[in-house]
A protein has these predicted regions:
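Ser/Thr/Asn(+Pro)-rich, low-complexity disordered segments
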Residues: 137, 142-145, 151-157, 167, ...
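Short alpha-helical segments and helix-capping/turn motifs at coil-helix boundaries
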Residues: 22-25, 42-44, 99-103, 109-113, ...
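Phosphate-/polyanion-interacting regions in eukaryotic proteins
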Residues: 167-183
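Extended, low-hydrophobicity, Ser/Thr/Pro/Gly-biased non-transmembrane segments
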Residues: 17, 59-62, 73-142
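Acidic, contiguous internal or C-terminal segments within carbohydrate-active enzymes
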Residues: 4-63
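Conserved small/polar residues in nucleotide/adenosyl-binding loops
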Residues: 1, 184-188
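A general structural signal for short secondary-structure junctions and capping/turn motifs
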Residues: 3, 28-30, 49-51, 59, ...
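Short aromatic-acidic-glycine turn motif
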Residues: 67
Length: 188
């Protein structure tokens, strides 16, 4: 069996909220073929139990890339993939949603991760998450005027996105970039 390489450079940025004496760490890891980041909530006096209401991670695209996507849906992933430009997602969404009794689409431009894209220059971009433990799964909502994706977490019945206890951390938000689409399926 072959071991996976896990070589990266790391930067941890601590943001302090002085009025409430709380902080959060945003941890970045840069790899040869992409990056990951996550939010960490250290053990601290003024933060114990808390509720995630929203997450606003954003991914700005450099162009109107070709995307391979399925509709963002809280209840099912049983869709065929649609291939389109990012700017075409809104117009194609209604046709991409097939008849199914358990569907909860959240936006006319919302897609599920993993989202694969191809640039005009032949680069492949993949947006996804990793180490999803005790946290809501991430979809992506596209601002199709500015070509910016924003994280969209699956809510519970009352709209909350997570019940947390410090110390804790979010899943990794991942961006893989490669000129080889097989990189995503390669075991090495």
């Amino acid at each position: 069996y072959k071991r996976q390489r896990n070589h990266y450079n790391e930067l941890a940025v601590t943001l302090d909220q002085k009025a409430q004496e709380r902080n959060i760490v945003i941890r970045f890891r840069l790899y040869d073929d992409g990056l990951g980041f996550r939010y960490e909530f250290p053990l601290q006096k003024n933060l114990n139990y808390f509720v995630i209401k929203e997450e606003h991670s954003q991914f700005a695209m450099t162009g109107d890339h070709t995307a391979f996507w399925i509709p963002g849906d809280y209840d099912t992933q049983e869709y065929d993939y649609t291939e389109s430009k990012l700017s075409e997602i809104r117009g194609l969404m209604k046709g991409a949603i097939t008849g199914n009794a358990s569907q909860t689409s959240f936006s006319p431009t919302g897609v599920q991760t993993s989202l694969q894209m191809k640039t005009a220059d032949g680069l492949y971009i993949n947006l996804h998450e990793a180490a999803l433990v005790d946290y809501s799964c991430m979809h992506l909502n596209l601002d199709d005027k500015n070509l910016v994706f924003e994280s969209w977490l699956t809510p519970d019945a009352v709209g909350d996105k997570g019940y947390m206890q410090a110390p804790c951390k979010s899943p990794w938000r991942t961006v893989i970039v490669s000129d080889d689409c097989l990189l995503y399926t390669s075991p090495s």
